[in-house]
Amino acid sequence: MSGSIRRSYTAMQNFPRFLLGVLFVATLSSCRPRLSEDEANWKGQTETSEVEEHLLLDPGNALRLFCDTNQSSSINWYREQERLLSGGKIRMVGTVLEVSDVTYEDSGLYICVVRGTGKILRRFSISVVDSLASGDEEEEEEDDDDEDGRREDTTADINEEPVYFFQAPYWTQPSRMDKKLHAVPAGNTVKFRCPAGGSPLPTIRWSLKNGREFRGEHRIGGIQIRHQHWSLVMESVVPSDRGNYTCVVENRVGSLTYTYFLDVLERSSHRPILQAGLPANTTARVGSDVEFYCKVYSDAQPHIQWLKHIEVNGSHFGPDDFPYVQVLKTADINPSDVEVLHLRNITMEDAGEYTCLAGNSIGLSHQSAWLTVLPNEDFLEQAEPAESRYMDIIIYTSGFLAVAMAIMIVILCRMQTPHSKQTLQTPTVHKLAKFPLIRQFSLESSSSGKSSAPLIRITRLSSSCAPMLPGVMEVELPLDAKWEFPRDRLVLGKPLGEGCFGQVVRAEGYGIEKDRPEKPVTVAVKMLKDNGTDKDLSDLISEMELMKVIGKHKNIINLLGVCTQEGPLFVIVEYASKGNLREFLRARRPPTPEDAFDITKVPEELLSFKDLVSCAYQVARGMEYLESKRCIHRDLAARNVLVAEDNVMKIADFGLARGVHDIDYYKKTSNGRLPVKWMAPEALFDRVYTHQSDIWSFGVLTWEIFTLGGSPYPVIPYEELFKLLREGHRMDKPSNCTHELYMLMRECWHAVPTQRPTFKQLEHLDRILTAVSEEYLDLSMPFEQYSPSCEDSASTCSSSDDSVFAPDPVPSSPCVFNYHNIHSQLGT
């Protein structure tokens, strides 16, 4: 009895475990898809003639499929031979399958099968068009049209030709693939397409001529593979992109291949070409409408302006021999809009010369036409009575004014006579305003740069203390023994140039080299003229002190000494015998074909690609040194880089430079004129200068080097330049510049300052320098197209804009020096 009770008790204890095991097995059975009986049955029917129904959906849409059946038995749903279960975004109610928020992965073959028998009731081929990436939003309109056509064609094919469960890939639009050879200019965007179909939906990949898969890292600039468009897109193609491109379309049944050949054509290195005879001379009457036409042909992006020649102060030309003009119409994004100039309801004032001016990164072209305006006869009849009526009034008024002016002249002459005599008896005095100039540099220096005492002691120097050169302002400065050079050991020679308020004189210095005191060394001496202001004097002294603090480097103009005692202020610097870099490059351009046999126009030396890379590398080294000294240059350009013997580059013109110690940026608050074509956007719009803004200027300088002294942004007015820079436009690649170097320029012109390289990184140009030979690039082609159609201003003032037409005479801006002798120019 007790044993029976014990067995019953044990059974009761094990019953919950038994029940839990049964439930667990049942749960697993219900969760696991039934792939045995019905799946085996319908898999045997995959080659039947049941017709698929095709549906094309956009991502995010809902898929709803009905399995029509009169049978009472339940059904199962499969996608690509995998059974579907309710859950997540899949919902099955009776014979209806619902899939919410479909994606590209939901594409494939859907079938409904009678549970137990495996009989296939319906087949659905679902294609979900993958969403466009953000970079695809700029798809051309014709591509969109092509895609619409593809969808329509696909639909037509589906209606006319049934597609079965398994089908090898096939071309859906073979007529669009007839063009196997694609020849495009460099810089264009290329698109290859291989639209295909098949069941299941095939995949596409692209391979190069060696058979390996083509990926984005295989090409500078990357690629875009658009699976939903069956396309390969490459932007800004270069000659190295030439070759075969093969698309491979495949699914589980088979595969297809198709090969395209890409040929990239070099762009034409030529300034814009204007159609002969346009614009044409026109004659019209007052009140009529006139149109001038100008047809422009240019491979590079042209910039077009319509100009009207005007008269200013009785002259049509300014002091620089440039005509005075008024800009009537400007366009650069859509040149066709500006190829026609419309003049409505013209008057007599509209008569004159009109010019169509077109420019690109290579150079400028222009053609002019005259408009003759004839008066209307009615207008003449009405004007004659008015003229006779007012003639008497004009005569009497003119006579009265002439007498009054004569009396005024006599009175003024009598008043000026005593004053003039008194002035002749008074000795001339050069006056200096009483202002203390405190040093602004806190860098470590053994010179007097640590002193905070005023640098200028106000004195009056009469004309009896005659300076060494006439018209030179004198000032007394404290003695700095480290830099002071004896004035009597300096023999001044001929002037090298003069600028806004100063001049530079070539000189021989005895004792510049300490170990050879009797050997003369050729130097350049800077000094003020008598029309220099207190601000000019302050700038020159500040520059002198900055050069003391910066120290010496091979690739900058170095300070050799100063003369501050017993005479005018002299700043002695190194002499660069080959002038500034811009004129150095222009003088060494290969001759044009028409000048090839003119010995006088053949340059003394030609530059190789290696020489040009060396120029950029040396400037980068000099700027890296200035950056290490916390100096922001602010006016880095080819005109401010000098060339010494052995083609050594020396950065000059510290007139705009600023030394900074506690912060690495400088914000300008004055409204002086600035070198806008070399300035970074943050410097243009926010007046904030950093080492990164100098990097932007270095990119423009590199562009100048590889165009052999070309003018950046030709013809573009400042207002238009601001807009283009904001929109992300940049200058084209020079024709004799490699893609690698152009990509370096583009990195220097990055809109985000922190994304630009540093000068330390730019010093890696030496890698390119050692990798190329002297004959790497042939520079024997004519470079005259890089010059503007007139000579650029030789001024080193920051206001130089390299325009071919001056809209108005502009006074020189206050810069340190502005040399007219540009061949032997020495900048500060």
Swiss-Prot record:
Binding-site positions, ATP: 496-504, 526
Cytoplasmic membrane side: 414-828
Active site: 635 (proton acceptor)
Biased composition (Acidic residues): 135-147
Domain Ig-like C2-type: 33-127, 169-259, 272-372
Leader peptide range in chain numbering: 1-31
Residues spanning the membrane: 393-413
Domain Protein kinase residue range list: 490-777
Gene Ontology CC entries for this record: endoplasmic reticulum; endosome; plasma membrane; receptor complex
Gene Ontology molecular function: ATP binding; fibroblast growth factor binding; fibroblast growth factor receptor activity
Subcellular location: Cell membrane; Endosome; Endoplasmic reticulum
Matches recorded under InterPro entries: FGF_rcpt_fam (IPR016248), Ig-like_dom (IPR007110), Ig-like_dom_sf (IPR036179), Ig-like_fold (IPR013783), Ig_I-set (IPR013098), Ig_sub (IPR003599), Ig_sub2 (IPR003598), Kinase-like_dom_sf (IPR011009)
Region Disordered, annotated ranges: 132-156
Glycosylation sites: 70, 244, 281, 313, 345
Keyword terms, alphabetized: ATP-binding, Cell membrane, Disulfide bond, Endoplasmic reticulum, Endosome, Glycoprotein, Immunoglobulin domain, Kinase, Membrane, Nucleotide-binding, Phosphoprotein, Receptor, Repeat, Signal, Transferase, Transmembrane, Transmembrane helix, Tyrosine-protein kinase, Ubl conjugation
Reaction(s) this enzyme catalyzes, per UniProt: L-tyrosyl-[protein] + ATP = O-phospho-L-tyrosyl-[protein] + ADP + H(+)
GO BP of this protein: fibroblast growth factor receptor signaling pathway; positive regulation of cell population proliferation; positive regulation of ERK1 and ERK2 cascade; regulation of bile acid biosynthetic process
Residues the record lists as Phosphotyrosine modifications: 665-666, 776
Disulfide bridge positions per record: 67-112, 194-247, 294-356
UniProt family annotation: Belongs to the protein kinase superfamily. Tyr protein kinase family. Fibroblast growth factor receptor subfamily.
Name of the featured protein: Fibroblast growth factor receptor 4
Organism per entry: Xenopus laevis (African clawed frog)
